[in-house]
A protein has these predicted regions:
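Domain-level marker for long, solvent-exposed, non-transmembrane regions
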Residues: 1-101
Length: 101
């Protein structure tokens, strides 16, 4: 399915659902830490702090330290920290919907 077709279908859905925007609205702050290991490895840690106090972390590291780029590390570590929030928010929505019955 092409991206445009997917976005159209998602836009037509009327039932409650978790969206990227709904998750982002619950984020309090995002912090990044670039780090080096004693053996010369490099990596980036992302910590997403939610408004309710929950934290989600993601880590990214290149196979070769010569490929380390802070912006790339932040991008991938953020994705890894954000991904588990979909499942958690989906569970919360399902729990809420089940109580409405």
């Amino acid at each position: 399915m092409e991206q445009a077709e997917l976005e159209k279908k998602l836009g037509e859905m009327k039932a409650p659902r978790v969206t990227e925007e709904s998750i982002k609205a619950k984020i309090d702050r995002v912090d990044y830490m670039s780090m080096a290991t004693p053996s010369g490895g490099m990596g980036t840690l992302c910590v997403i702090s939610m408004k309710n106090g929950w934290i989600s972390t993601g880590f990214s590291a290149p196979a070769s330290k010569s490929n380390f780029d802070p912006a790339v590390g932040e991008h991938y570590s953020y994705q890894k920290a954000f991904e588990p929030l979909w499942q958690l928010e989906g569970y919360l929505l399902k729990e809420s919907l089940s109580k409405d019955k």
